Amino acid sequence: MSSPLPAPSAEALAHSGRLQAHIRDQVRAAGGAIPFSRYMELALYAPGLGYYSAGARKFGAEGDFVTAPELGPVFAECVASDVFAQLGGRFDFIELGGGSGAFAEAALRFLHARDALPAHYRILEPSADLRERQMERLREALPPAVFNRVGWLDGPPERGWRGFLFANEVIDA
């Protein structure tokens, strides 16, 4: 059966081979087995090799897939509007896996225009490459006072917080 998908380039095949070798090395170093969670961590985030860490564009028309935030601001505006309606004044917004930063940009612009910004907007992003892209996008797109509310997390908050946890497409990954 033939596939309608394009064949990977020689460069893509070589990259895939390097990632496979890295994962094999990790399995060997662990005595022959690793948990599935570790396998997924390596496949997605191994520095310079993982799907989200190798520098290739993943989102939008030139990427591998398109999510609602990449199509325009409406989705983020609807979510932000509802979050503000439910939580009112001071709250924290935590986004898991911020992708290109499109959702954060649209949500923060929308809330800023209504004088309804969260106390903090945090993005939990394991990919250093995506983190850098998000920072660049948001720094350029948002007024400094809005950008200064944005921060990046290395893990879930360890203390209690009042706010909203948003995870678009995370379960799919």
State where each predicted segment sits:
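Rossmann-like AdoMet
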Residues: 2-96, 100-161
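A short SAM/SAH-binding and catalytic strip from SAM-dependent methyltransferases
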Residues: 156-173
